[in-house]
Each structure stands twice: as structure tokens, then as C-alpha cells.
């Protein structure tokens, strides 16, 4: 399923919440490598949780955060026009509210 993306390409929406997109200026090879590493550490979180290994979980979560910053999904925004960041905010409470309200209703999985 493709999630709706804001007209400016900065966010996608899941269950009414805005999530910052990956920086589109990243070279494809770099984006692929970072995404691969991100998936590895997300899986490591799951393994650590199942093993009840708090230290491994903490390390994996730190790596996920680091990689999401590198991808532009967290940390400083990747756009340069001075617009504020609405990451993780409900779309209805942001300047994207009108756009969001006009989206067709999608069935959630």
C-alpha cells in the first residue's frame, strides 16, 4: 500500500499522522545502503525484545535513530525554505489540514 504524500513531498500520512519522507536529494546508492542498515537494526530490536536483552535493544534503537537522521526522516529538516517541521503531528492540526480533509477515505489494513 502506498500512503498519501503531501503535495510538497515532505511527508506521507499513516492513520492521520504526518511522517517525514526520506531526503529526496540523497544519492540512490546511499539511500539504499542506509535503508538496508535501518531494516537490519529494526530486526535487531525485535530480536532483542524477544531475548529480553535491554542492552541490545538500547543499542539497536540508537542505531535506528542514527540511520533515520542520516535518511532525513528525523533531526534537522532537509528542505531549505525555512518551513517548520510537522513530523509525527496529526495532519488535521497542521497547515496540511485542508489537503488531508480532501483525500479519499482509504481502508486501513
Q: Where do the model's predicted regions map?
A:
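Extended, charge-rich alpha-helical interface modules
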Residues: 1-109
